């Protein structure tokens, strides 16, 4: 299975993708870290599945492991939970020569990365993502964040892991809804890339097929994202392409207040933005076919909400009174359009009822 290298100006690290890799965690961590204290951060769902075996491997490799368990779910991605982890690290006498490992989905990875980047001005950390969403998206690229009541990811840093270890077989323990929600990000990237990757997702007709093709789907998604990240670490240019579907998707997700998963909101956002900037190539229809096959939603009543634009207007990706919109001219042909928020608002209101 592939190993993808991320080579940045200030740091290099590897992303290893291999079935059964969960049985070799101790050896893999030994390759990048000397013996030290490790805080293994996990949640109340993933912990009971994998925490014991990974703790045992790390201990056998000579590491001193402290397990820190957070509640499962988006609500744990908070400043309050970060403070709880800071205090636990202080109690266990962690310093900058020690390290953190994130074992879980996107919430665990985002929170652990944020704590690693800020505790004592930075501790090394490793990602072991266990959900498809985390494996193809949040574990790669160095974005860390916590949420505020006003919205998602409003406090965060850019901070790269020192290693990412991905075992596609871990996806077999995911509930189907969580598997499918991660697939929305795969479809997003495949639509940006086009060509063989788009042909591959067109062959996926069920959640079972996602599992069957998981190693290839993960590797292709990460290869593209790593290429983008290496060219634009802090999202000042090309990396904005990865926000395809997220402008409206994040707003809907915030308004849904936990009713929708991130991937479900992105799926809705992909269709909405494609309808808003419809092309002769019928992008929305092509995306809808691929998304609906696995049970992802493509519309939602909240798209009609008067509060939708207010959420979009407070998106952290905006630049003053300007908004950067990513849409496709055709599959594999993404473009970034910068518009005044007032113009986008008018265009949104004009087509909002058709969503």
From Swiss-Prot:
One of its GO terms (molecular function) is 3-dehydroquinate synthase activity. InterPro entries: Dehydroquinate_synthase (IPR050071), DHQ_synth_AroB (IPR016037), DHQ_synth_fam (IPR030963), DHQS/DOIS_N (IPR030960), DHQS_C (IPR056179). NAD(+) binds at residues 106-110, 130-131, 143, 152. It is an enzyme of class 4 (lyase). It is found in: Cytoplasm. Pathway: Metabolic intermediate biosynthesis; chorismate biosynthesis; chorismate from D-erythrose 4-phosphate and phosphoenolpyruvate: step 2/7. GO terms for cellular component: cytoplasm. It catalyses: 7-phospho-2-dehydro-3-deoxy-D-arabino-heptonate = 3-dehydroquinate + phosphate. Binds 1 divalent metal cation per subunit. Can use either Co(2+) or Zn(2+). The keyword Amino-acid biosynthesis applies. This is 3-dehydroquinate synthase. It comes from Latilactobacillus sakei subsp. sakei (strain 23K) (Lactobacillus sakei subsp. sakei). The gene is aroB.
């Amino acid at each position: 299975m592939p190993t993808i290298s991320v080579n940045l100006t200030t740091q290099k690290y590897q992303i290893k993708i291999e079935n059964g890799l969960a049985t070799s965690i101790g050896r893999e961590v030994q390759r990048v870290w000397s013996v030290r204290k490790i805080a293994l951060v996990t949640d109340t769902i993933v912990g009971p599945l994998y925490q014991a075996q990974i703790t045992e491997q790390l201990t056998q490799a000579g590491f001193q492991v402290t397990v820190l368990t957070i509640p499962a779910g988006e609500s744990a991605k908070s400043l309050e939970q970060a403070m709880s982890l800071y205090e636990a690290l202080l109690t266990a006498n962690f310093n900058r020569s020690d390290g953190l490992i994130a074992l879980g989905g996107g919430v665990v990875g985002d929170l652990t990365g944020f704590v690693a980047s800020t505790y004592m001005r930075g501790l090394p950390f490793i990602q072991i993502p266990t959900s498809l969403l985390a494996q193809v998206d949040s574990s790669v690229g160095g974005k860390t964040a916590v949420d505020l009541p006003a919205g998602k990811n409003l406090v965060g840093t850019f901070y790269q892991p020192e290693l990412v270890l991905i075992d596609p077989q871990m996806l077999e323990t995911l509930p189907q809804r969580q598997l499918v929600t991660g697939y929305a990000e795969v479809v997003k990237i495949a639509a940006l890339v086009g060509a063989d990757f788009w042909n591959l997702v067109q062959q996926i007709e069920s959640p079972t097929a996602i599992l069957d093709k998981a190693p290839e789907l993960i590797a292709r998604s990460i290869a593209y994202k790593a290429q983008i990240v290496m060219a634009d670490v802090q999202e000042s240019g090309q990396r904005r392409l990865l926000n395809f579907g997220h402008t409206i998707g994040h707003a809907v997700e915030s308004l849904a207040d936990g009713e929708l998963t991130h991937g479900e909101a992105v799926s809705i956002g992909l269709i909405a933005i494609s309808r808003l900037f419809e092309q002769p190539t019928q992008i929305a229809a092509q995306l809808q076919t691929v998304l609906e096959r696995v049970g992802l939603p493509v519309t939602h009543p909240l798209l009609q909400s008067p509060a939708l634009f207010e959420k979009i207007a407070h998106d952290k990706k905006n630049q003053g009174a300007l908004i950067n919109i990513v849409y496709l001219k055709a599959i594999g042909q993404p473009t970034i359009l910068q518009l005044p928020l007032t113009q986008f608002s008018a265009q949104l209101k004009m087509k909002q009822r058709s969503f």
